[in-house]
Amino acid sequence: SSILASLRAMSHDHSHEHVDPAGLVHEVATRLAAVGQRLTQTRRSIVEALAGADRPLSIPEILTGGAGLAQSSVYRNLSVLERAGVVSRVVTTDEWARFELSEVLTGHHHHLVCSKCGAVDDVRVPDDVEADLDRALAVLAERAGFALQHHRLDLVGVCGACR
């Protein structure tokens, strides 16, 4: 089918490469202020680590990338950043949650999640396929009496490294 062809043709998306650093800092500071918080150096370091990654990161990966960050501080600050809508948690199949900048900052995308190693890759669906998916999900939601606001799609399988 044409949808399968489009999906096969899609490439892994380095969705954060187009984020403007100055605009990002301003948007993050604004979102934090809206929930009564400030953009501290620790929060800035976490946001910079996530913005510089081409996929969602685990806390150990954030700690590796952020000079001098304490694990307890990263946990606390990720929670604040989540509440402010700056960071989203990606549930995976291993023991580590992964974190990424929220879609309001990076744009809508989906995830490929490896059921063996827990790796997560960002992937963007072509606009025409995304529109078809939106319509199909809206119909399913309506039939269930559910008011759909948005969707998140994680495709679970086995990555190339584990195959």
Task: Describe the residue ranges of each PLM region.
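N-terminal leader segment of winged-helix/HTH proteins
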Residues: S2-R38
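Short helix-capping/hinge SLiMs at alpha-helix to coil transitions
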Residues: V35-Q37, A51-D54
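Short capping segments at the starts of secondary-structure elements
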Residues: Q41, A53-S58
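Pre-recognition alpha-helix immediately N-terminal to the DNA-recognition helix
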Residues: R44-A49
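A short acidic, leucine-rich amphipathic alpha-helix
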Residues: E61-G65
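Basic amphipathic alpha-helical segments that dock to polyanions
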Residues: V74-G85
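Non-DNA-binding regulatory cores of transcription-related proteins
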Residues: A84-R163
